[in-house]
């Protein structure tokens, strides 16, 4: 045996281990030190493990909801992540005059190597694209949002009568199908047919998204994972993996639809794709915006559909009062075959139910991180944040603030918006607006989501009686950045 080699090996490996441990300890210390003045769980201050554990276990919402009560309005949830439930701080960060750019967190929402409005971190590029697409989202440029969404609500009612009356139905799945058909009808002029498909899952898209939800959340939240997965070298591998899933098949379908429109002499009219083409989006940009509509337009709206209907079904006072308001409107001849948004807005209790539904279960749990600009910034509460710090809303805590909504924030009580004095109602509604973002960052699909909620709630309770089958376990729920619910079993009968 060569003793020289033995001794060298005996020295090298302990040295390597010591250097590695020292590097980890130093990195952890520097991570902690930079934002040491922001309270939060200790593990979150030195690593991303705290956040990973919440995402993997699917308990993000209940954990984040309790943070302000323990740590205050600013809470550190990662080495460089800060969440807040303070409305004034959020208006400062996201307001029209803010210089806070998007954080790299947004890049996690790319579905292929191309960006879209939801993943661009360059503010000027984001603004340029939004200026071209916002008309479509708002129902301008000849787009019939009322007709597109209304037709899918009619399909929902007819499919319930055809297949689901008098027997248990997984309402979480039914609402997902409704949301997907509504957004594809708006986007492409024709729904993909999730509601009418025998298995309710066109291309296997729904099951693929469910299986990949945890991964997609981690890819957005963890900078290391995000940088690897979204790198140019990994793009072919990601594309290859997606090609064999329902997500890949859905993306290929949207690419074909968009390509056919660009190849035609006339892009068509009446849907958002035609509007995007007329406004000057390139084919690649239009594909990206179509992908964004599927991601953001269905998987967020469906949370509010499911949860609000669950709260309605399990709160007899609300169920009875809302049914009575709907019946009175129908009997008085105040509504057409499918209620319009203008007609819905004249029903005060329905509007209060929609607001309270968004409050109890916001479409997003947390996220939409912005970066503190160069030179750092002092927040309205006097706290200084160094440049590059990522700060975002803690949405679930924001909607449960007792000083804004009253001591009974955990109770589903739409009356809080009706009984409040005008100044208090204005304060509550202004705080609710933060769920959709502000200024240039405001959710482009806000009007579509509100229209869908109003039409679905009204028409379902107009035609049917709904009863939750297992009130002791109404659903199975996972929460990461967004909510995901399954096994929400409901019995549906014709309205009595």
Curated annotation (Swiss-Prot):
<feature type="glycosylation site" description="N-linked (GlcNAc...) asparagine">
    <location>
        <position position="252"/>
    </location>
</feature>
<keyword id="KW-0560">Oxidoreductase</keyword>
<keyword id="KW-0503">Monooxygenase</keyword>
<comment type="similarity">
    <text>Belongs to the cytochrome P450 family.</text>
</comment>
<keyword id="KW-0812">Transmembrane</keyword>
<dbReference type="InterPro" id="IPR036396">
    <property type="entry name" value="Cyt_P450_sf"/>
</dbReference>
<dbReference type="InterPro" id="IPR001128">
    <property type="entry name" value="Cyt_P450"/>
</dbReference>
<dbReference type="GO" id="GO:0004497">
    <property type="term" value="F:monooxygenase activity"/>
</dbReference>
<keyword id="KW-0472">Membrane</keyword>
<keyword id="KW-0408">Iron</keyword>
<dbReference type="GO" id="GO:0020037">
    <property type="term" value="F:heme binding"/>
</dbReference>
<dbReference type="GO" id="GO:0005506">
    <property type="term" value="F:iron ion binding"/>
</dbReference>
<feature type="transmembrane region" description="Helical">
    <location>
        <begin position="10"/>
        <end position="30"/>
    </location>
</feature>
<dbReference type="Pfam" id="PF00067">
    <property type="entry name" value="p450"/>
</dbReference>
<dbReference type="GO" id="GO:0009820">
    <property type="term" value="P:alkaloid metabolic process"/>
</dbReference>
<dbReference type="GO" id="GO:0016020">
    <property type="term" value="C:membrane"/>
</dbReference>
<keyword id="KW-0017">Alkaloid metabolism</keyword>
<keyword id="KW-0349">Heme</keyword>
<comment type="pathway">
    <text>Alkaloid biosynthesis.</text>
</comment>
<dbReference type="InterPro" id="IPR050121">
    <property type="entry name" value="Cytochrome_P450_monoxygenase"/>
</dbReference>
<keyword id="KW-0479">Metal-binding</keyword>
<comment type="function">
    <text>Cytochrome P450 monooxygenase; part of the gene cluster that mediates the biosynthesis of loline alkaloids, potent insecticidal agents composed of a pyrrolizidine ring system and an uncommon ether bridge linking carbons 2 and 7. Lolines are structurally differentiated by the various modifications of the L-amino group and include norloline, loline, N-methylloline, N-acetylloline, N-acetylnorloline, and N-formylloline.</text>
</comment>
<protein>
    <recommendedName>
        <fullName>Cytochrome P450 monooxygenase lolP1</fullName>
        <ecNumber>1.-.-.-</ecNumber>
    </recommendedName>
</protein>
<keyword id="KW-0325">Glycoprotein</keyword>
<dbReference type="GO" id="GO:0016705">
    <property type="term" value="F:oxidoreductase activity, acting on paired donors, with incorporation or reduction of molecular oxygen"/>
</dbReference>
<feature type="binding site" description="axial binding residue">
    <location>
        <position position="443"/>
    </location>
    <ligand>
        <name>heme</name>
    </ligand>
</feature>
<dbReference type="InterPro" id="IPR002401">
    <property type="entry name" value="Cyt_P450_E_grp-I"/>
</dbReference>
<keyword id="KW-1133">Transmembrane helix</keyword>
């Amino acid at each position: 045996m060569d003793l020289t080699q033995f001794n060298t090996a005996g020295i090298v490996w302990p040295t390597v281990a010591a250097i590695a441990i020292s590097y980890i300890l130093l990195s952890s210390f520097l991570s902690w030190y930079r934002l040491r003045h922001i309270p939060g769980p200790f593990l979150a201050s030195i690593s991303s493990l705290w956040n990973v554990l919440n995402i993997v276990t699917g308990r993000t919402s209940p954990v984040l909801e309790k943070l302000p009560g323990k740590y205050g309005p600013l809470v550190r949830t990662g080495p460089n992540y800060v969440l807040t439930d303070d409305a004034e701080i959020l208006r400062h960060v996201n307001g029209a005059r803010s210089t806070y750019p998007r954080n790299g967190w947004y890049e996690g929402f790319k579905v292929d190597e191309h960006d879209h409005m939801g993943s661009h971190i360059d503010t000027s590029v984001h603004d340029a694209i939004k200026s071209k697409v916002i008309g479509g989202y708002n129902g301008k440029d000849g787009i019939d949002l009322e007709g597109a969404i209304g037709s899918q609500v009619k399909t929902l009612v007819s499919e319930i009568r055809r297949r689901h009356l008098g027997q248990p139905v997984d309402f979480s799945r039914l609402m997902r199908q409704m949301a997907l058909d509504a957004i594809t009808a708006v986007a492409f002029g024709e729904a993909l047919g999730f509601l009418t498909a025998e298995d309710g899952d066109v291309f296997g898209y729904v099951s693929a998204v469910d299986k990949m939800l945890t991964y997609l959340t981690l890819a957005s939240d963890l900078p290391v994972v995000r940088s690897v997965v979204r790198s140019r070298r990994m793009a072919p591998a990601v594309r290859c993996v997606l090609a064999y899933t329902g997500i890949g098949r859905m993306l290929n379908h949207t690419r074909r639809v968009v390509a056919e429109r660009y190849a035609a002499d006339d892009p068509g009219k009446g849907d958002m794709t035609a509007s995007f083409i007329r406004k000057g989006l390139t084919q690649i940009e239009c594909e990206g915006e179509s992908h964004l509509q599927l991601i953001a337009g269905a998987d967020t709206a469906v949370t509010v559909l499911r949860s609000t209907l669950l709260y309605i079904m399990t709160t007899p006072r609300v169920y009875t009062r809302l049914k009575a308001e709907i019946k009175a409107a129908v009997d008085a001849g105040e509504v057409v075959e499918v209620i319009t948004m203008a007609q819905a807005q004249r029903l005060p209790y329905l509007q209060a139910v929609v607001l309270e539904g968004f409050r109890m279960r916001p479409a997003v749990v947390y996220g939409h991180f912005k970066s503190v600009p160069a030179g750092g910034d002092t927040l309205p509460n006097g706290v200084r944040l160094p440049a590059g710090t990522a700060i975002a809303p803690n949405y679930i805590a924001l909607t449960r603030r007792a000083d804004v909504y009253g001591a009974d924030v955990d109770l589903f009580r739409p009356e809080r918006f009706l009984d409040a004095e005008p100044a208090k109602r204005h304060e509550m509604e202004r705080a609710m607006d933060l769920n959709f973002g502000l200024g240039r960052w405001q959710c482009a699909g806000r009007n579509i989501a509100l229209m869908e909620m109003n039409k679905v709630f009204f028409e379902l309770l107009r035609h049917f009686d709904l009863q939750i089958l297992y009130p002791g376990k109404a659903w199975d729920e996972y929460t990461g950045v967004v909510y995901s619910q399954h096994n929400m079993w409901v019995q549906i009968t014709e309205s009595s």
